[in-house]
Curated annotation (Swiss-Prot):
Pfam families, per the entry: Med20 (PF08612)
Superkingdom as given in the UniProt entry: Eukaryota
GO molecular function, one term: transcription coactivator activity
Swiss-Prot/TrEMBL GO biological process terms: regulation of transcription by RNA polymerase II
UniProt family annotation: Belongs to the Mediator complex subunit 20 family.
Gene behind the chain: MED20
Disulfide bonds: none
Full protein name: Mediator of RNA polymerase II transcription subunit 20
Gene Ontology CC: mediator complex
Length: 218
């Protein structure tokens, strides 16, 4: 895999109309349909009787179907873990310690396109079957270090998303590296967990939206 950037797209029409608008733009570029994709997230909260509150986010990405991504949030730091599918079973077995917040299960799914070295995904974000927004994912496959290809990716994103895309690199990549505090994530080799972390960041923002603006519906 290469480097991936997520970009929320503002809604001026319904969700379906927005996706259709973006789909036409992507097809006009010459991108070729390449199946469907799905990224989902379910969140578990620890039993308050067992000590300080902790949260576990369990995510799946159709690009890595054999992997389960989990992120433990202690309140002061996040600890990522990548495992196989048995981890889902484990979470059901420790129900007394961690309880799923079913009403906040959230996912982004939609069509996947390929355009040369780029992969484009147009995602409709829903939480408990309620439409929350549109999230565009773009991957540039030949690149391994975000800082080396951001300018190219920015130009590509702005080419079909317009001025909604900032000239500045997304805040996720400007964070200090956990491996080398002297570097930012922009200078590290990109990993699948980086895509998951970006999705969790955006999913968290969507969850904070108690209701969609008037007139914005799927």
């Amino acid at each position: 895999m290469g480097v991936t950037v997520l970009q929320p797209y503002p809604l001026e029409k319904s969700g379906a109309q927005t996706i259709d608008f973006l789909l036409k733009r992507v097809v006009a570029l010459g991108a070729v349909p390449a199946g469907q994709f799905l990224v989902d997230c379910e969140t578990y909260s620890s039993n308050p009787q067992l000590g300080p509150p902790k949260t576990v986010h369990i995510l799946h990405n159709s690009e890595q179907p054999a992997s389960v991504f989990s992120i433990l949030d202690t309140g002061t730091k996040q600890i990522p873990l990548v495992t196989d599918g048995l981890f889902d079973l484990l979470m059901t077995r420790i129900a007394p310690a961690y309880t799923s917040k079913k009403q906040t299960k959230i996912e982004s799914k939609g069509q996947r396109f390929e355009f040369g070295d780029f992969v484009i995904k147009l995602g409709s974000v829903t939480m408990s079957q309620n439409f929350k927004g549109v999230l565009v994912e773009v991957e540039y496959r030949p690149c391994l270090v975000p800082g080396s290809c951001w300018e190219l990716m920015r130009e590509f994103l702005q080419g079909f998303l317009g001025s909604n895309v900032s000239n500045s690199m997304p805040a996720y990549f400007t964070q200090r590296s956990s491996i080398n505090p002297n570097h930012s994530k922009a200078n590290e080799i990109y990993q699948p967990i980086d895509t998951i972390n970006q999705y969790l960041e955006h999913f968290t923002n969507y969850r904070k939206q108690t209701m969609a603006p008037v007139g914005v519906r799927p």
